[in-house]
Amino acid sequence: MKNLEASFRATRALYTAAELFKQHGFNKVGVDRIVSEAKMTKATFYNYFHSKERLIEMCLLVQKEQLKEKVRAISEARQYPDLVHQLRQIYLLHADLKGAYYLLFKAIFEIKKLYPNAYQTALRYRRWLKNEIFWVLRESKKRATYEESDIFVFMIDGAIFGLLGTDQAKDRDTLLEYFLKR
């Protein structure tokens, strides 16, 4: 039972930290705030994570694995009648300020120099996502190019910037419709 309690505390700390990082950024949230909001001692925190960098890395790994699972489910599901519906679901999953991708997106801009190992986690996910989108495109368009998957990921990033600036999902949807018509 003790391991289950320890696991619960570590998981709570991961999710608390992820939410704080999404709201305030990686550099404005310190260990003190995380342990306070996760209701754990600093000693317990360092016992689980050893450092803030390791915590960030684990937060990003959790987000990455959740996203991979969801993207695979979308790309393998037969419930979507065509490519347009699959791409729409992948796009909407990522172009969301409350979603798992937003933390990985923030990491690209905020942690490169301070936390290089965690930064690599975010880059690896983007590379994986581009490859996955390429194969989704390739299944329906025999002449799909890798550049199209690059454009799709850049479009997701642009939608996030748009949401940060105006917080209007309408702009996000307009961008997607333009891409899908091409």
PLM-predicted stretches and their roles:
Residues E65, L97-A100, Y115-K142, Y146-D150:
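Amphipathic alpha-helical packing segments from all-alpha helical-bundle domains
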Residues M58, R72-G99, F152:
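Hydrophobic alpha-helical connector segments
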Residues M1-H24, K28-E37, R54:
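Basic, helix-initiating cap at the start of DNA-binding domains
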Residues F49, A107-Y115:
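Short helix-capping/turn signature of helix-turn-helix
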Residues A13, S51-E57, Q66:
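Short amphipathic alpha-helical segment with a characteristic S/N-K-E followed by hydrophobic residues
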Residues K106, R138-L180:
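Hydrophobic/aromatic-rich alpha-helical bundle segments in the mid-to-C-terminal region
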Residues A17, K39-F49:
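Short hydrophobic/aromatic patch on the recognition helix
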Residues K22, Y46-H50, M58, V62:
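Base-recognition residues in the alpha-helical recognition helix of bacterial helix-turn-helix
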